Regions:
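Hydrophobic transmembrane alpha-helices and immediately adjacent juxtamembrane helices
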Residues: 1-260
Length: 260
């Protein structure tokens, strides 16, 4: 199994960056630089309101980076797992290769890509903009990123099976990332969110992990509610159980559909 995942990982790596490998690697760095440019423009526009929006010691730039980059990783893993079965149909003719191997390889690849992107973004933010980019609690931030990885993997498996069999739901799943993006405090700080709306968003497990990630990253970060890791861990276990059970009982059906 490890050999299969290893081979799939590097196959996906080559496919991900296309035929021009050097241009693909350059884009890995160019994409976050584009994001930084956009965020810098936004930060410049609202700079005069900085002290009214952000607590002391937290820049808007780093606030946005600490939410956008982890969310991009989460979204990319879910999308890649959803498309994993259809993109590897020819490989499933070989008995050792199973869809679960593709899921693992794709999830690990996206994690590695966005981990490198995050490090590069932090390096440029610290080097050129002289911002504080070292988390105050490195282990806490790492654990939150690990929870994001696990949640995206478990959710991706569920969506992959649904995406493969239930055509009418495909459109709804496409809009899922948009909904999650605007309900997880990626852009708008929780302390600026109306209380009645925050009480509803509290049930979003991704909001918990994003807020805790920022709490571990910044000094004096204000938590608007009692966010905790146990809530997101519960959802990870629940979704992973559902996803693996659905996958296990449909693995033969997946093979049958592929052969047709």
């Amino acid at each position: 199994m490890l050999n299969v995942i290893y081979a799939l990982f590097f196959r996906e790596l080559k496919t991900r960056f296309g035929a021009n490998r050097h241009l693909g690697y350059l884009w890995v760095v160019g994409e976050p630089m584009t994001i930084i440019l956009i965020i810098t423009i936004i930060g410049t526009v609202i700079r005069e309101f900085h002290h009214q929006v952000m607590p002391e010691g937290i820049s808007i730039f780093m606030f946005l980076i600490s939410g956008i980059m982890p969310f991009f990783m989460f979204r990319s893993i879910v999308i890649q797992l959803m498309n994993g079965i259809g993109a590897n149909l020819a490989l499933f003719a070989y008995k050792p290769v199973k869809p679960i191997h593709v899921f693992i390889a794709r999830a690990l690849l996206e994690f590695c890509i966005y981990f490198v992107i995050f490090i590069v973004v932090l390096f440029f933010a610290g080097w050129f903009f002289h911002l504080e980019v070292i988390p105050r609690d490195f282990l806490g931030v790492s654990f939150c990123i690990f929870l994001l990885f696990c949640s995206s993997f478990s959710l991706g498996i569920c969506f992959a099976v649904v995406w493969h069999f239930v055509e009418p739901l495909r459109t709804l799943l496409v809009y899922f990332s948009v909904v999650v993006y605007w309900t997880s405090a990626i852009i708008l700080p929780t302390w600026l969110t109306p209380r009645f709306l925050l009480d509803i968003l509290y049930y979003n497990p991704l909001l918990h992990v994003i807020e805790l990630l920022r709490y571990y990253f910044f000094e004096n970060y204000p938590l608007a509610d009692d966010y905790n890791n146990y809530y997101i861990i519960f959802w990870i276990i629940f979704l992973l159980f559902i996803g693996l059970v659905v996958y296990y009982y449909n693995r033969q059906a997946l093979t049958a559909v592929r052969k047709e």
